[in-house]
Amino acid sequence: MDMKKLIERINFLYKKSKEEVLTEEEKIEQQKLRREYIDIIKGNVKVQLEGVEKIPTPNRKN
């Protein structure tokens, strides 16, 4: 599922949960979608951090 559709579905289930009680299937789906979203974000952050290079700083005397 692409990120836009994932977020739309998460938001839909959240709004629905505020208006009425979610079924057990919907609660399970909501948990899975949230976990998938978090895993995608973690993966993106990891890739970005792996691409970061440390820039050496010159030794300074104060």
Curated annotation (Swiss-Prot):
Cellular localization per UniProt: Cytoplasm
Reply yes or no: does the keyword DNA damage apply.
no
Q: Which residues form a coiled coil?
A: none
A single Gene Ontology CC annotation of this entry is:
cytoplasm
**InterPro entries in the record, alphabetically?**
DUF896
The record's annotation in SUPFAM superfamilies points to: YnzC-like
Looking at the record's lineage, which domain of life comes first?
Bacteria
Annotated keywords:
Cytoplasm
> Which positions carry the signal peptide feature in this UniProt record?
none
Q: Which family does it belong to?
A: Belongs to the UPF0291 family.
Name of the protein in its database record: UPF0291 protein CLJ_B2839
